[in-house]
């Protein structure tokens, strides 16, 4: 539905409501105008869709969905990404991982291991680091060190904290270590 809309269709809540009339999916999903704008931007403005996924079979399904809809997909967590790393690399999908995750928390993460960042880096996947959203977020730097201790290159770990993030989210004024850029 959102892929059939134009800029004019999403210019106001009234226009969105008019455009939604007759679309059963919009009614079934109880979409609000703000939801339609978000979907429109996702499909038409190349905004990244971040999906928290762990199981290798689910990652492969998401790759199919990415191809079908032309989505700018980013995988989050992706503890079994190592099992399908070639497919992820082939489709140029960045991955956000927690470098401290090294054992399975569920049956969706049975292939979880401490070397995942190094393994993904080896096949050219843009790796980014994240940490559990707690007061310990500052430990992300230590996580980068753990990734290096377990096979990731120093350069890859720095890029996982800086330029890979900037490139994956189309941020042009920061995140790259270069003269004239903001260094946060």
Walk through the language-model features, giving the residues of each.
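Short acidic active-site motifs
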Residues: 38, 83-84, 116
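Active-site-adjacent beta->alpha loops and helix N-cap segments on the catalytic face
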Residues: 80-90
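Polyanionic/metal-chelating signatures
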Residues: 1-73
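His/Asp/Glu-enriched, well-ordered alpha-helical/loop segment
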Residues: 48, 89, 98-102, 106-184
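Amphipathic coiled-coil/heptad-repeat helices and related helical stalk/stem segments
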Residues: 35, 55-58, 81, 112-113, ...
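Catalytic beta/alpha-barrel core
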Residues: 50-54, 72-80, 100-106
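Glycine-enriched alpha-helix->loop->beta-strand junction motifs that scaffold or abut catalytic
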Residues: 66-73, 89-96, 124-126
């Amino acid at each position: 539905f959102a892929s059939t809309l134009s800029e004019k269709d999403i210019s106001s809540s009234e226009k969105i409501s008019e455009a939604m009339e007759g679309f059963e999916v919009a009614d079934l999903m109880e979409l609000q105008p703000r939801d339609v704008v978000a979907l429109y931007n996702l499909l038409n403005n190349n905004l990244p869709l971040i999906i928290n996924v762990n199981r290798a079979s689910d990652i492969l399904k998401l790759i199919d969905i990415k191809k079908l809809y032309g989505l700018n997909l980013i995988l989050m967590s992706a503890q079994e990404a190592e099992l399908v790393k070639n497919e992820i690399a082939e489709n140029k999908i960045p991955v956000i991982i927690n470098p401290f995750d090294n054992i399975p928390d569920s049956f969706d993460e049975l292939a979880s291991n401490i070397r995942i960042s190094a393994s993904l880096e080896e096949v050219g996947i843009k790796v980014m680091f994240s940490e559990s959203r707690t007061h310990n977020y500052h430990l992300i730097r230590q996580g980068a060190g753990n990734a290096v201790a377990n096979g990731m290159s120093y350069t890859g770990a720095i890029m996982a904290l800086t330029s890979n993030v900037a490139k994956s989210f189309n941020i042009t004024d920061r995140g790259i270590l270069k003269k004239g850029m903001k260094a946060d």
